[in-house]
């Protein structure tokens, strides 16, 4: 039987607890929340008084599209988001802790002294953790920062802010707002 490990060079198979990959799964959560907000902010046909004769025509239609239950039920959506919030927040905190870059050690000027990041697991030829291992980069330096990771952290922070706001974690939401602002200011240089 052919396994994935036989196709990947052994030096790329090792997993290290401080190496992170882009938090791409948060994109699905961001989209889910956007779809929830779109559903709740748009008035239904019944709200607009336009459902009178339509129900009879579609009375044999299924109640909902399979897989959309969480979008159709605010209670299910809230329960789901609350169930993933804690583990996702732990992952976010781990990401910030393990991928933090150095600013003051290299006399850099930045609005925020804490919101700078660099990929760990860098070699002379590869930055496998970034997801762009063939992207050309200069020789590694202990003080380097990575724009792609700083941008990912801005996106991850925005996702966490949106979830916190949606599930009522107002203190966390306020914290994420400040972190997001600091990341954006560091990216903009303002």
Predicted ranges, named:
Residues 32-39, 170, 190:
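Secondary-structure transition/capping motifs at alpha-helix termini
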Residues 96-113, 151-190:
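Catalytic cores of carbohydrate-active enzymes
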Residues 1-30, 34, 41, 145-147:
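Substrate-binding groove/exosite segments of carbohydrate-active enzymes
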Residues 1, 13, 27, 91-99, ...:
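Tryptophan-centric aromatic hotspots in well-structured domains and transmembrane helices
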Residues 23, 27-30, 86-89, 147, ...:
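A structural signal for well-ordered alpha-helical segments within the folded catalytic domains
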Residues 36-147:
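Active-site acid/base region of carbohydrate-active enzymes
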Residues 12-20, 75, 79, 137-151, ...:
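Alpha-helix capping and helix-loop boundary segments enriched in small/acidic/polar residues
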